[in-house]
């Protein structure tokens, strides 16, 4: 009976189960032979207590390893009075240890050692291939340089290739210099008939007149192609076909200036494009000189007459834009020929301001244009010919030169003939060593003037005076 009291409750119940809750199961941490807590305490050496908490005993591994992926069930221990808050004991599945490929360390000499089992991972067959086509995400568009490397061969028609290039220049005008040469070479290989050349001219003209910001870029493109396209059919080369297309629009100028709003808007775009062509289209003479197209000069004069003859606000605004763009060049060209066309245009502007029923803002624009022309179109010319200053022709030649001092304190300048060599030497030293004063004293001390920094902090007196100045300025500002 005393043995029953000496033995802890439940100590013998786990003897035959191996994995009981009160015995040597992983949760209990007891001996394999079913010894109770009292007997276990006598056999184990005293363990030092961890500060603040009790360290639980280590969990031992199961005696046998279940098959990979299998679960084993542990029967519940006999019913015992449940503790308050304790969960009811049920059959609990136990998972295999995570490192089932390793050998299980021996915990009990009496238990048989199970053979280690190796889990073979299933082999996944990949569908990837080195010969698969290149992957592009949805919405990806190839860059311009890639799409134009092979020329127009990747496009169904020549018009699609040219239109794509024009749209690209509209969005990225800075790429003109780097890509125009390749574009011209491609056109030389694709444009081989009269119809293809006529289609090219029409595409460029429509782009330049339908998109306002493309008129300047379109004029530059026309100038480049007029010099680099080699095709010259019986109907005319690129420049001749371009001028013929502009003449077609020019011949209906009077009707367009009187037309509806849509017609006038299209006519104004043509006028500004013709002005850009006059400035950018270069014609090389027989002796290599570069001139402008005189036929465009005559056309611009007649277009101005058509605009001022129909003094509506949008017509007058278009005339102002054209004169701001080409006024100085037109006036110089007319003066060389002894013509007074610009004087006549200015007189017509003054008459419009006095008599026409245009808006106040448009009249103000016309007056600003007259003022701009009176200031020579904003150009500034030197009043006298530049001459290099010398001691002979400039009395103030030595005024801004620095003054140096000898070791005796005698000042000398570049005008002193006795010290010219010494003066030049000091000037050269000052250029290479800016930390030197006029008398050759090194401001930065004995160190390297290139490496040593000059202490630029203010003196206490200067700092105090500066603070007073700031306070005084703040006081005056608040008054």
Curated annotation (Swiss-Prot):
<dbReference type="GO" id="GO:0044794">
    <property type="term" value="P:positive regulation by host of viral process"/>
</dbReference>
<dbReference type="InterPro" id="IPR016024">
    <property type="entry name" value="ARM-type_fold"/>
</dbReference>
<dbReference type="InterPro" id="IPR051367">
    <property type="entry name" value="mRNA_TranslReg/HistoneTransl"/>
</dbReference>
<feature type="compositionally biased region" description="Pro residues">
    <location>
        <begin position="45"/>
        <end position="69"/>
    </location>
</feature>
<dbReference type="GO" id="GO:0048255">
    <property type="term" value="P:mRNA stabilization"/>
</dbReference>
<comment type="function">
    <text>(Microbial infection) Upon interaction with SARS coronavirus SARS-CoV NSP3 protein, plays an important role in viral protein synthesis.</text>
</comment>
<comment type="function">
    <text>Acts as a coactivator in the regulation of translation initiation of poly(A)-containing mRNAs. Its stimulatory activity on translation is mediated via its action on PABPC1. Competes with PAIP2 for binding to PABPC1. Its association with EIF4A and PABPC1 may potentiate contacts between mRNA termini. May also be involved in translationally coupled mRNA turnover. Implicated with other RNA-binding proteins in the cytoplasmic deadenylation/translational and decay interplay of the FOS mRNA mediated by the major coding-region determinant of instability (mCRD) domain.</text>
</comment>
<keyword id="KW-0945">Host-virus interaction</keyword>
<dbReference type="GO" id="GO:0006446">
    <property type="term" value="P:regulation of translational initiation"/>
</dbReference>
<dbReference type="GO" id="GO:1900152">
    <property type="term" value="P:negative regulation of nuclear-transcribed mRNA catabolic process, deadenylation-dependent decay"/>
</dbReference>
<keyword id="KW-0007">Acetylation</keyword>
<feature type="region of interest" description="PAIP1 middle domain (PAIP1M)">
    <location>
        <begin position="157"/>
        <end position="375"/>
    </location>
</feature>
<dbReference type="GO" id="GO:0003723">
    <property type="term" value="F:RNA binding"/>
</dbReference>
<dbReference type="GO" id="GO:0008494">
    <property type="term" value="F:translation activator activity"/>
</dbReference>
<dbReference type="InterPro" id="IPR009818">
    <property type="entry name" value="PAM2_motif"/>
</dbReference>
<dbReference type="GO" id="GO:0005829">
    <property type="term" value="C:cytosol"/>
</dbReference>
<comment type="subunit">
    <text>(Microbial infection) Interacts (via PAIP1M) with human SARS coronaviruses SARS-COV and SARS-COV-2 NSP3 protein (via SARS-unique domain); the interaction increases binding affinity with PABPC1.</text>
</comment>
<dbReference type="GO" id="GO:2000767">
    <property type="term" value="P:positive regulation of cytoplasmic translation"/>
</dbReference>
<dbReference type="GO" id="GO:0070934">
    <property type="term" value="P:CRD-mediated mRNA stabilization"/>
</dbReference>
<keyword id="KW-0810">Translation regulation</keyword>
<feature type="region of interest" description="Disordered">
    <location>
        <begin position="1"/>
        <end position="114"/>
    </location>
</feature>
<keyword id="KW-0963">Cytoplasm</keyword>
<feature type="compositionally biased region" description="Polar residues">
    <location>
        <begin position="98"/>
        <end position="111"/>
    </location>
</feature>
<feature type="compositionally biased region" description="Gly residues">
    <location>
        <begin position="11"/>
        <end position="33"/>
    </location>
</feature>
<feature type="region of interest" description="Disordered">
    <location>
        <begin position="435"/>
        <end position="455"/>
    </location>
</feature>
<dbReference type="GO" id="GO:0006413">
    <property type="term" value="P:translational initiation"/>
</dbReference>
<feature type="region of interest" description="PABPC1-interacting motif-1 (PAM1)">
    <location>
        <begin position="440"/>
        <end position="479"/>
    </location>
</feature>
<dbReference type="GO" id="GO:0106002">
    <property type="term" value="C:mCRD-mediated mRNA stability complex"/>
</dbReference>
<feature type="region of interest" description="PABPC1-interacting motif-2 (PAM2)">
    <location>
        <begin position="116"/>
        <end position="143"/>
    </location>
</feature>
<keyword id="KW-0488">Methylation</keyword>
<dbReference type="GO" id="GO:0005737">
    <property type="term" value="C:cytoplasm"/>
</dbReference>
<protein>
    <recommendedName>
        <fullName>Polyadenylate-binding protein-interacting protein 1</fullName>
    </recommendedName>
</protein>
<dbReference type="InterPro" id="IPR003890">
    <property type="entry name" value="MIF4G-like_typ-3"/>
</dbReference>
<feature type="domain" description="MIF4G">
    <location>
        <begin position="159"/>
        <end position="376"/>
    </location>
</feature>
<dbReference type="Pfam" id="PF02854">
    <property type="entry name" value="MIF4G"/>
</dbReference>
<dbReference type="Pfam" id="PF07145">
    <property type="entry name" value="PAM2"/>
</dbReference>
<comment type="subunit">
    <text>Interacts with the RRM1-RRM2 and C-terminus regions of PABPC1 in a 1:1 stoichiometry. Interacts with EIF4A.</text>
</comment>
<feature type="modified residue" description="Omega-N-methylarginine">
    <location>
        <position position="21"/>
    </location>
</feature>
């Amino acid at each position: 009976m005393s043995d029953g009291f000496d033995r802890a409750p439940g100590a013998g119940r786990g003897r035959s189960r191996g994995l009981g809750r009160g015995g040597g199961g992983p949760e209990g941490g007891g001996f394999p032979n079913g010894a109770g807590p009292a007997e276990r305490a006598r056999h184990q050496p005293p363990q030092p207590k961890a500060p603040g908490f009790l360290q639980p005993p280590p969990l031992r591994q199961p005696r046998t390893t279940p098959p990979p992926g299998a679960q084993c069930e542990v029967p519940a221990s006999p019913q015992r009075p449940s503790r308050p808050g304790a969960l009811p004991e049920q059959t609990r599945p136990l998972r295999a240890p995570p490192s089932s490929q390793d050998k299980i360390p021996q915990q009990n000499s009496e238990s048989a050692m199970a053979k280690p089992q190796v889990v073979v991972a299933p082999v996944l067959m990949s569908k990837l291939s080195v010969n698969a086509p290149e992957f592009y995400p949805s919405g990806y568009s190839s860059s311009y340089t890639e799409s134009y490397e092979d020329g127009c061969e990747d496009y169904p028609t020549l018009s699609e290739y040219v239109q794509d290039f024009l749209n690209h220049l509209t969005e990225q005008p800075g790429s003109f210099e780097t890509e125009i040469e390749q574009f011209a070479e491609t056109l030389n290989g694709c444009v081989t008939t009269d119809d293809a050349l006529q289609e090219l001219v029409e595409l460029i003209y429509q782009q330049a007149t339908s998109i306002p910001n493309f008129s300047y870029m379109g004029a530059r493109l026309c100038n480049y192609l007029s010099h680099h396209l080699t095709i010259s059919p019986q109907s005319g080369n690129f420049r001749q076909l371009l001028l013929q297309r502009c003449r077609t629009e020019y011949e209906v100028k009077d009707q367009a200036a009187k037309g509806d709003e849509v017609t006038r808007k299209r006519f104004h775009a043509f006028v500004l494009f013709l002005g850009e062509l006059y400035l950018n289209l270069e014609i090389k003479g027989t002796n290599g000189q570069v001139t402008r197209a005189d036929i465009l000069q005559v056309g611009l004069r007649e277009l101005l007459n058509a605009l001022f003859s129909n003094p509506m606000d949008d017509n007058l605004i278009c005339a102002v834009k054209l004169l701001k763009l080409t006024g100085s060049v037109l006036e110089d060209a007319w003066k060389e020929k002894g013509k007074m066309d610009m004087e006549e245009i200015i007189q017509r502007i003054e008459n419009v301001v006095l008599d026409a029923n245009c808006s106040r803002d448009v009249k103000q624009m016309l007056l600003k244009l007259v003022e701009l022309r009176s200031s020579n179109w904003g150009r500034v010319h030197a009043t006298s010919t530049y001459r290099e200053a010398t001691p002979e022709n400039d009395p103030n030649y030595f005024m801004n030169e620095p003054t140096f001092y000898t070791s005796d304190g005698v000042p000398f300048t570049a005008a002193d003939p006795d010290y010219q060599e010494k003066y030049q030497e000091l000037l050269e030293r000052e250029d290479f060593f800016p930390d030197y004063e006029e008398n050759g004293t090194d401001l930065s001390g004995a160190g390297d003037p290139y490496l040593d920094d000059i202490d630029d902090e203010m003196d206490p007196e200067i700092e105090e005076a500066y603070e007073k100045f700031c306070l005084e300025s703040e006081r005056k500002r608040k008054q």
